[in-house]
């Protein structure tokens, strides 16, 4: 239940809402997403959920009409996280394990595949590094195969892993302004 409370608090958080507003008002070519379809894996993760929030707000506020197919493992988390969009015809959540082939006959062409699913938990890297990297490889292959089968113009992969760097030991929780250090040879 703690995760669900954090999700609700994030959506209602004024700093988070300010970040979303800064992004949608930034002079980016949002019109290139007009009447397009996106498939986003890792929908309930850091990058995926923020991107979905931005696109769905652009749909509501600016009539972008961009269909979002969102993939994730936990439907309950998705229902809580995206409750504001769950009934929209422009949003569809699909419960999916990135390790499995993704074959859907109910999805037509998709313009962009954004592969944002990855196990970024440090314990997983430490206790099962091969399983963790294998999931990343298989997941990427599955998304590329889907992109080809559905004639996507682009397929992009990204991760937020260690976006703040390692804790220097001077704080208990990370904040947006925190800049730790990143050591590329640590797992």
Protein language model regions, located:
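Short glycine/proline-rich turn/loop motifs
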Residues: 32, 117, 121-123, 176-183
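Phosphate-coordinating loops and pocket residues in cytosolic domains that bind phosphorylated ligands
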Residues: 35, 80, 126-127, 134, ...
């Amino acid at each position: 239940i703690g995760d669900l409370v954090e999700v609700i608090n994030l959506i209602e958080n004024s700093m988070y809402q300010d970040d979303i507003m800064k992004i949608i008002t930034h002079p980016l070519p949002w019109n290139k997403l007009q009447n397009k379809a996106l498939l986003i894996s890792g929908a309930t993760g850091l990058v995926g959920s923020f991107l979905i929030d931005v696109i769905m707000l652009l749909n509501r506020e600016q009539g972008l009409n961009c269909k979002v197919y969102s993939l994730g493992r936990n439907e309950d988390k998705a229902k809580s996280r995206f409750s504001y969009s769950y009934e929209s015809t422009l949003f569809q959540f699909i419960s999916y394990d990135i390790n499995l082939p993704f074959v859907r006959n109910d999805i037509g062409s998709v313009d962009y595949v954004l592969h944002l699913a990855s196990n970024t938990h440090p314990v997983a890297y430490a206790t099962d590094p091969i399983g963790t990297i294998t999931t990343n490889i298989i997941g990427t292959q599955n998304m590329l195969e889907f992109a080809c089968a559905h004639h996507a113009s682009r397929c992009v992969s990204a991760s937020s892993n260690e976006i703040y760097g390692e804790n220097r030991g001077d704080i208990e929780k990370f904040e947006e302004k925190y800049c730790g250090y990143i050591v590329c040879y640590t797992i």
